[in-house]
Each structure stands twice: as C-alpha cells, then as structure tokens.
A protein has these predicted regions:
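Central cavity-lining transmembrane alpha-helices of secondary-active solute carriers
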Residues: 62-78, 270-283
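Cytoplasmic helix-loop-helix junction between adjacent transmembrane helices
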Residues: 117-156
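A membrane-interface helix-boundary motif in multi-pass transporters
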Residues: 170-183, 378-396
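Short amphipathic helix-loop junctions that connect adjacent transmembrane helices
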Residues: 41-57, 248-265
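C-terminal ends and interior cores of transmembrane alpha-helices
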Residues: 96-109, 303-317
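Juxtamembrane intracellular "pre-TM" segments in multi-pass secondary transporters
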Residues: 5-18, 197-235, 257
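Helix-to-loop junctions at the C-terminal end of transmembrane segments
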Residues: 74-86, 279-293, 380
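Conserved MFS/SLC helix-loop-helix module at the cytosolic interface between two early adjacent transmembrane helices
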Residues: 73-111
C-alpha cells in the first residue's frame, strides 16, 4: 500500500492501493505501444486505395484529423462522466473502444473502413485525459509534475517498443500491427477489470452534469475566460498545431523525402521514444531542482524551434542526418514541455474538477491536432516538404511570449464551476 497526503480541501489522508499505480502505469505503457505501433504503416495502408503521393499525403493527414475531431467532442464528455461516475468505468470502456478501433482499421477493405476505425478510436480516445485525472487523484499537487514526467517516461518506453515492433510485424502484412494493438489493449481491459481500484471516492465526485460540461465549445470558452489559465492554454494550442502536423506527415515525409520503409520508420520512432525516456526519466527531475514549471516549458519550446529548423534544413539539402538531429532536439523539447504543462494545469483545480480540466485540455489539444494535420497536409503538397517545419518555427516562436507573460494559475479556477 502507498500513502499520500490528500490534495482536497479537507486535507485528509488518502490511501492508494498499489494496483492504482500499477494499472495506471500499465495503461499508459500500453497506450504508448498501441498508438505508436501503427504509426509506421499508416501510409502503406492507404497506398492500395490511392496511388498519387500528393493525394495519399492528404488522406493520411485527414485520418489524423478525423481522430482528433472525435476526441475534441468526446474528451469533455468523458472527463465530466469520470468526475461523476468515477475513473474506473470510463477507462475500461475507452480502452475497449480503442481495441475495437484498431481492429476495424486493420480489417480495412475500403477507405471508408479506415476512417470508421479512426472515428471509433477518437470517440474513446479521451482515455488519456481520464488517466491523467486518475493520477492527479492519487498524487499530491506538489509532486505531480515529477510524477507526470515519470508517466510520460513510461509512455516513452511504450513508444520505444511500439514502432520497431510495428515495423517488424508489417513484414507479415500491414494490418498485423493493428491486430496486435487490439490484443494488447484488450489485455489491459482484462487486467483493469479485475485489479484496477477506483481513484475518486464518492464524496469527492461531481453531484450533477450540466450541458455546459458536455459542450466542448462552452468548455473552451469557460477555460479561456480564465485570465490566469488562458495564456497557458493558448500557448499550448499554438505549439500543438505544428506538432500535430509533424506527427501526421512524419511517415509520409520520410517515405517521400528519404525513401524510408516501415522498418526504418519504426526504428526512428523507437529511437525518439528512447530519447523520451532519457529526457523525462533522468533530465526532467534534475531540471525541476533548478527551474519551475514555466521555465521548463519555455526551454522545451525553444528546443522545438531549433529542432524544426534542422528538420527544414534536412529537407532543403536532402540530408537525413540533419533530420535525425532535428528530431532529437525537437523530441527533447516536447518531452519536457508535456509534464511541465500538465503540472501547471493539474495544480489549478481540486480533485472533483481534474477530469473536467484534463478533458477540456485534451479538447483543445484535439482541436489543434485536427487543424494541424489539415494545414500541414495542404502546405506539404503545395509548398514543399519543408513547409510544416517552417510553420512550427513560426507558431512556437509566437507562443513563447504568450506563455512567458502568464500569471499564476493557482488562484481562481473556482469561477468555472
């Protein structure tokens, strides 16, 4: 058993069964594998239906946008439901939906079936916000940034294994990684059903759910109306747009620019995942000793700009070592931005609102990842392969002063209730 001092108003002691931590870590680990295992093969699954490389790039990015579109509408609903009914049932349902989505995407047979699979995954894709709310329930506020860093490192372990495994499994058929992703997600559901404890006790649950909590647009308006929260979210939004674009075009980009195959693409994803582990598991704790959350976030954003610059240069000179160096520096920045952002965000609310704020944050991220791939796909085809990287440099450079001027968010979140 692990003991943590409760972070609610009563300041009572909270006892957390070890399975709470184990299940949460296993969940994010398998989410890392499940999500990353399919990344190297998506363009190759689209290829049988569309032969033109330009149109293929558009469809690949649209598949990402459709997923994000569904997450945008589903995340606040799932967050509110988890605040009222608890994290456990929502997590299990979401994980089951993800497994079904992987299965449908793998079966394929027509382009619309691929989109159907992504839609199913997107509707249940709010599980990530629920998992972060789950950890926020059991971790004291002053330790959350550190633990969110470890959670991200565990995801990194999954993303080390997933892409390489996906690239290897693709040798037996491009759909095989999807089936494998479905199987490991179902195993997580089974483990959670028997061993996962509830993290949000009934006395701290939401009493009722209003339409405001379920409407993503109202949710966004309420969140952005908070003077101490809006700059944090706007800066993250500006960062997530190009990052969503890069994620969507990565496989297509490496295939078109450097002629990479699924195994090599998967290996690159895995190397990036290993870099995540180093950054979040070893570098992040040392940064927290000397810097606060905001300073770490800004350091991450500057690193991403440098990374995007090298990615753009690699395209202009067709020199893949520059691309690899750029991805490493970009990955470092992204690795330290995420935990610091989630740390700042989670400290702004009490336990009964964690699902809501995390769901609202995921809706904003989903909106960015819906817009980013669409813009990225269009400029990739019309302006050249370096265009998404230039977009990243410009938007993140604009985001830094927005975040730098933000005030302390620990004050007045109660207005949003």
């Amino acid at each position: 058993m692990f003991k943590f001092r409760s972070h609610n108003e009563q300041n009572t002691e909270q006892i957390v069964d070890k399975h709470a931590l184990i299940f949460g870590l296993i969940s994010v680990f398998l989410c890392g594998i499940g999500f990353s295992i399919i990344a190297p093969v998506v363009p190759f699954l689209v290829q049988p239906y569309i032969s033109n490389p330009g149109e293929q790039a558009i469809v690949v990015t649209l598949l990402t946008s459709v997923y994000a579109f569904c997450v945008f509408f589903a995340a606040p609903v799932l967050g509110a439901l988890s605040d009222k009914y608890g994290r456990r049932p929502l997590l299990l349902v979401c994980l089951l939906g993800s497994a079904i989505g992987y299965l449908v995407f793998g079966i394929g047979g027509a382009l619309w079936v691929l989109f159907a699979g992504r839609i199913i995954e997107g509707i249940t894709g709010g599980s990530i916000s629920t998992i972060f709310a789950y950890f926020a329930d059991i971790i004291p506020p002053e330790q959350r940034t550190k633990y969110f860093g470890w959670v991200s490192a565990v995801v990194g372990v999954g993303t080390v294994i997933g892409p390489t495994l996906g690239g290897l499994l693709a040798k037996f058929g491009y759909s095989v990684p999807m089936y494998f992703g479905a199987v490991i997600t179902l195993l997580n559901v089974v483990y959670g059903f028997f061993f996962m404890p509830e993290s949000l006790d009934k006395k701290h649950r939401l009493k009722e759910i209003t339409f405001v909590r379920l409407n993503p647009f109202t949710q966004l308006a309420n969140l952005l109306s908070m003077k101490n929260l809006n700059r944090l979210l706007v800066s993250a939004f500006l960062l997530w747009i190009p990052n969503g674009s890069l994620q969507a075009v990565f496989s297509q980009f490496t295939m078109d620019t450097f002629g990479w195959k699924p195994a090599l693409i998967g290996l690159m994803f895995s190397i990036m995942g290993f870099q995540d582990i180093i950054s979040q598991g070893f570098i992040m704790p040392k940064l927290l000793i000397k810097l606060n959350d905001k300073q770490i976030a800004i350091l991450g954003m500057v690193s991403e700009i440098i990374g995007y610059s090298l990615i753009a240069l690699s395209t202009l000179f067709s020199f893949y070592p520059l691309f690899i160096a750029g991805m490493f520096i970009f990955g470092f920045g992204d690795s330290i931005f995420g935990p610091s952002f989630n740390g700042m965000l989670s400290k702004s609310v009490d336990s009964s609102e964690q699902g809501r704020i995390q769901g609202g944050s995921q809706s904003i991220q989903a909106l960015a990842r819906m817009i980013g791939p669409i813009i990225g796909g269009q400029i990739y085809v019309s302006l050249g392969h370096a265009a998404p990287a230039f977009m990243g440099m410009i938007l993140i450079a604009a985001a830094i002063p927005v975040l730098y001027k933000r005030t302390n968010i620990n004050e007045d979140f109660a207005k949003i209730s």
